[in-house]
Amino acid sequence: MNFSDLNIENKLKKSIELAEFKVPTPIQSQSIPISLEGKDVLGTAQTGTGKTLAFTIPMINKLLKDKQAMALIICPTRELATQVMETVLKLNNREIGIGNALLIGGESMQKQLRQLKKRARIIVGTPGRINDHIERKSLNLSKVNYLVLDETDRMLDMGFTPQIELILKFVPKKHQTLLFSATLPENILKISHKYLD
């Protein structure tokens, strides 16, 4: 499979080409076609295997097709959230132009509020800061129909389960979930039964 073979919007194909992504990695060729069908995904992938692109391509395709839809990507650390946003921005170029917001601790709240006011439809962040914005009523997740839990094993190890569950109360029941984890211990399998269809 090549990226050009994917059944995606032409704008996005062009954007992948411009970003010089050529041949899909195993995680990309396995998960992208499933995600594009709107199905939930449980993916095992280490950092550096191209998993970010594996969820970014179907996400942008979905948001291009549905102008009301939103995507939420939850990451365990601000460093990972920043890296994820860098990949998102490589594809979400000026031509595509979907509003986005990076919600992480240690960064200016004002800047984040400005990003959210500009009708951000791609939200990348850490559980703590996402919950801060929910409490402040600056983040409305009622249109989220694409949810990514990235490095889920790390999030559980760091004790984020209650925070994630709190966030998910604000996400509509009907949404697509992609759960990525480096390993698949018992607790991940449990959480996948809970969150995935």
Segment roles from a protein language model:
Residues 29-41, 51-66, 82, 86-92, ...:
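Walker A/P-loop NTP-binding motif
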Residues 45-49:
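The conserved Walker
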